[in-house]
Amino acid sequence: VLVAGSLSLVTIIGNILVMVSIKVNRHLQTVNNYFLFSLACADLIIGVFSMNLYTLYTVIGYWPLGPVVCDLWLALDYVVSNASVMNLLIISFDRYFCVTKPLTYPVKRTTKMAGMMIAAAWVLSFILWAPAILFWQFIVGVRTVEDGECYIQFFSNAAVTFGTAIAAFYLPVIIMTVLYWHISRASKSRIKKDKKEPVANQDPVSPSLVQGRIVKPNNNNMPSSDDGLEHNKIQNGKAPRDPVTENCVQGEEKESSNDSTSVSAVASNMRDDEITQDENTVSTSLGHSKDENSKQTCIRIGTKTPKSDSCTPTNTTVEVVGSSGQNGDEKQNIVARKIVKMTKQPAKKKPPPSREKKVTRTILAILLAFIITWAPYNVMVLINTFCAPCIPNTVWTIGYWLCYINSTINPACYALCNATFKKTFKHLLMCHYKNIGATR
């Protein structure tokens, strides 16, 4: 009883820590971790209800709460357990598409999509198990489970038992193993490619999320940007059709983000001109200001690192500032040359970020824990369909408890494989709430 109670308590605390960590730490609020949040919800329910009711059943030696509570407990237990498996499948597929479709999948990979997938996992698990467990006695016309016992009635049918074991465990495990093999292979291939590929052969423009910043010097006579300041973005070497305008005031920077590489340019004290470079077809319209006293030109290109779990690459920051003692024509030429130079400059590729390794490592740990803890019970289920007396009750109990222990192990997997989870857990346990939302 003491061991079972301790396991239940550790499971509850561990999974509450996971859920609270994701809630309070913005660096953990990623699509992948939302799937882990759903998994933690399932594990928490197992720790609160399933473990304690099963302990009661095994310690007393019979089921004391009647057939209705028995069926409700079994339905909850199997729905939640199946939801855990479905969440693991979702996590594996999500990682697989991140690695194999890095350009198209991240666009679709939104919080809304994650919520829909999580909801589908729970609804499907409920449909698969709850009606069959609760209403099987009415389908066959009789309840065959004896008083004082609690088990799923249709498990007495060997064919049904075999089919549910295949669908609930063996098939998902095969799918997840194959997916992880592809994930590992694709990740290694990318690492080798990044090491072998010389910088000169890399694309001149990086397909990352780039943030253009426009800074305008203070001038008391300066009109609003709506009157006389125009900004154009250069995207992938070509000017877009519509100009992008932003308000620039003292001490303020306006930011604009786009999924393609972009350069925002501002030039003051210049006449409208278009400068074209044939090699990369880079063109920009340099803005016009009514104020003749302003003599500073500033171009800044910055990359913005999105909050994600390594489905999107990141780059560096480049800043170019023009001098203030030149006439308009000279400024125009300087601005145009620097824009062209920056758009032609090869992007330096970095090795896959540590966050990507964290995610892959976490998934591997979760899958291994799931397979190791769930395999004994599901092997016994298959044996039981052919030879019921072959498995003693004690072995059944151990196998069943191993499935529950998986819910205890999962939070430890997150902490061991992800330093951010580990640090956030530590802050929560030690009541260090200051700056916990920014813990990395």
Curated annotation (Swiss-Prot):
Residues 192-329 are annotated as: Disordered. The modification Phosphoserine is found at S206. Its main location: membrane. The modification Phosphothreonine is found at T420, T424, T439. Residues 55-71, 137-158, 385-392 are extracellular. GO terms for cellular component: dendrite; plasma membrane; postsynaptic membrane; synapse. Interacts with ARRB1 and ARRB2. Interacts with RACK1; the interaction regulates CHRM2 internalization. This is Muscarinic acetylcholine receptor M2. The gene is CHRM2.
